[in-house]
A protein has these predicted regions:
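Short, cationic-aromatic polyanion-contact patches
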Residues: 15, 52-65
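Extended, compositionally biased flexible segments
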Residues: 39, 45, 61, 66-74, ...
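Residue-level marker of alpha-helix boundaries and capping positions
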Residues: 24-25, 59, 137
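C-terminal all-alpha effector/ligand-binding and dimerization domain
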Residues: 66, 79-221
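N-terminal helix-turn-helix
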Residues: 1-53
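Solvent-exposed, charged/polar functional surfaces in cytosolic regulatory/catalytic domains
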Residues: 1, 71, 149, 153
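Surface loops and adjacent helix of pleckstrin homology
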Residues: 48, 56, 218
Length: 221
C-alpha cells in the first residue's frame, strides 16, 4: 500500500494489533513486518503516537555541483557514510560518459562506500580519485565528505561535472548493500569531475535507490 501510494507520507500505519486482526497473522509476523518497513526506510516510529509513512524521497539537482552530504543536510536528513573497500591502482582508468571517453591518469585510488540518510542506505558509490592531485587520500577519513577533503586538504574545488543517469534494477548481490530482499528500480550515475580545464580529479559509478530518489534539472533559454 505504501509503495502504490495508497498510504501517502504522514499517514498512520496500522498498529501491530490491527495487522494481526486484519491479516490473521501471528504477533511475530506483524512485528517483523513493521520492523522490515522501518529498516527499509518506509516508515518512522514516533514515541507515544505510533508509526507513520515516511517521506523518504530525496531530490537531487543535477545542474548543481554539490555532494551527498550537503544534499542530505538540505533535505533535513542525517547523512552517514560507510567505507566498504578501497584499492590503489597504477594504471589509467577509462570511463565513457554521454558518448565521450575520458581517462583518469594513474595512479588512482578506487573506493567503495555506502551512503545513508537517517540510517537508511540510499546509495552505493564507486569513486576513482587521482592520486596525482590528491596524494595519500587513501590515508584520510574516507567516511567524510570527499568534496570537503578536496577543499580542506588539497585546496581543490570542482569546476565541472559531466554525468549520465540511466535506469537499472537492483537485484542479486546489490540488494545486500541496501538491506533489501526484493528487486527495486534504481538509478545508475556515471560521471567525471574536473577541477580545472580538462583536469580530471575523479570519476564515479554509483547506484541510487530509485524508490527514494528523484533527479531534477533546470534549463534556461
Amino acid at each position: 500500500m505504501i509503495q502504490m501510494g495508497t498510504l501517502p507520507p504522514g499517514s498512520p500505519v496500522p498498529s501491530e494489533n490491527e495487522i494481526i486482526e486484519q491479516f490473521q497473522v501471528s504477533n511475530t509476523t506483524a512485528r517483523k513486518a513493521l520492523h522490515e518497513l522501518e529498516k527499509e526506510g518506509w516508515v518512522t516510529r514516533v514515541k507515544g503516537k505510533g508509526t507513520f509513512v515516511k517521506d523518504q524521497t530525496v531530490v537531487r539537482a543535477i545542474n548543481r555541483i554539490f555532494g551527498f552530504t550537503k544534499n542530505m543536510v538540505e533535505a533535513g536528513r542525517k547523512p552517514a557514510t560507510k567505507l566498504t573497500g578501497f584499492h590503489l591502482h597504477n594504471a589509467d582508468h577509462q570511463q565513457t560518459v554521454n558518448g565521450h571517453e575520458f581517462t583518469l591518469k594513474g595512479p588512482y585510488c578506487e573506493i567503495e562506500r555506502i551512503r545513508y540518510a537517517d540510517g537508511v542506505p540510499l546509495m552505493k558509490e564507486m569513486r576513482y580519485i587521482s592520486l596525482g592531485l590528491c596524494p595519500d587520500i587513501h590515508r584520510k577519513n574516507l567516511e567524510q565528505s570527499l568534496y570537503g577533503i578536496f577543499a580542506k586538504d588539497y585546496g581543490i574545488h570542482l569546476t565541472e561535472i559531466n554525468q549520465m543517469v540511466s535506469a537499472v534494477v537492483l537485484d542479486g548481490a546489490q540488494l545486500k548493500h541496501f538491506n533489501l530482499e526484493k528487486p527495486v528500480p534504481a538509478f545508475r550515475v556515471e560521471g567525471v569531475s574536473f577541477c580545472g580545464r580538462n583536469l580530471i580529479i575523479e570519476m564515479e559509478d554509483s547506484i541510487y535507490r530509485g524508490d527514494m530518489y528523484r533527479f531534477a534539472a533546470k534549463a534556461v533559454r
